[in-house]
């Protein structure tokens, strides 16, 4: 079974790499935005008193680029792939083979996690080499927040795949959810500049908690217990509902 799963995961990896749009939005775009905007907009590299003296390109913008990659995978790539497989009867046919449908689901999750790790590593390393962005001041905290946040976003993606009747619907719903969730995370208005009420609302959203946790870890601070609890709650709730509602056919 382990050998079969390895072959299945390798096939899924090759299929992912053959999707140029998925590779672009999940890997190239976040890294490219970080480097392009960091190099061309002087204000990104200036110390900002409203950010505690940090440069905007350091913790805030770098965290948002990491988040952008994970959200793209969780709300677009993963659910679309699973719904397309269901529409084409791939999951149903797998149920008659030694490789069960659950193995395909696990392979999809594995590929998306690996891609998110690759994109994040490139973002951090190239940001550090090109822009002087500090590496995470608290590496263990960063890994913990990144792992929990990625699990949460992928669980939301599984829920979308579970309830969406078609690939067109899941793509539309995923895109619609992506923009407000990224806004609440601080993509266009950094969280320190948000009105108090909006920032409090953001604290209880999966992307708001994820983004702030990443910023804390990048700045060398421990993530706030509230944000870890919010991420764990969203992951558990959406994961359980997705498992209950997911349809193989």
Regions found by a protein language model. Give the residues of each.
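A short amphipathic helical element positioned immediately N-terminal to and/or at the very start
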Residues: 2-17, 214
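Short helix-to-coil transition segments within interhelical loops
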Residues: 93-102, 163, 206
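Alpha-helical transmembrane segments and their short interhelical loops
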Residues: 101-174, 179, 222-232, 239
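Transmembrane helix segments
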Residues: 28-29, 35-44, 161-204, 208
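Short helix-capping/hinge motifs at transmembrane helix termini and TM-loop junctions
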Residues: 37-46, 79, 127-135, 164-165, ...
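Membrane-interfacial helix-loop-helix junctions in multi-pass membrane proteins
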Residues: 52-55, 134, 186-237
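Hydrophobic alpha-helical transmembrane segments of multi-pass membrane transport/permease proteins
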Residues: 17-45, 59-77, 118, 177-183, ...
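Transmembrane helix boundary and interhelical loop/hinge segments in multi-pass membrane proteins
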Residues: 74-99
């Amino acid at each position: 079974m382990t050998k079969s799963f390895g072959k299945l995961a390798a096939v899924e990896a090759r299929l992912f790499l053959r999707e140029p749009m998925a590779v672009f939005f999940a890997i190239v775009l976040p890294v490219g935005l970080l480097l392009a905007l960091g190099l061309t907009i002087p204000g990104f590299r200036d110390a900002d008193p409203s950010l505690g003296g940090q440069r905007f390109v350091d913790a805030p913008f770098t965290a948002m680029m990491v988040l952008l990659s994970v959200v793209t995978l969780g709300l677009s790539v993963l659910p679309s792939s699973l719904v397309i497989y269901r529409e084409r009867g791939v999951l149903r046919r797998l149920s008659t083979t030694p490789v069960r449908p659950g193995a395909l689901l696990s392979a999809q999750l594995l590929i998306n996690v690996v891609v998110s790790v690759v994109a994040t590593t490139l973002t951090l390393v190239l940001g550090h080499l090109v822009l002087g962005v500090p590496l995470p001041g608290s590496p263990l905290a960063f890994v913990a927040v990144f792992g929990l946040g990625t699990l949460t976003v992928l669980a939301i993606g599984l829920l979308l795949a579970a309830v969406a009747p078609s690939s067109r619907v899941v793509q539309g719903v995923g895109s619609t959810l992506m923009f407000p969730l990224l806004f609440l995370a601080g993509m266009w208005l950094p969280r320190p500049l948000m009105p108090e009420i909006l920032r409090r609302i953001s604290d209880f959203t999966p992307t708001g908690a994820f983004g702030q946790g990443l910023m804390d870890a990048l700045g060398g601070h421990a993530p706030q217990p509230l944000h870890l609890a919010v991420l764990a709650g969203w992951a558990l709730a959406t994961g359980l509902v997705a498992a209950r509602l997911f349809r193989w056919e």
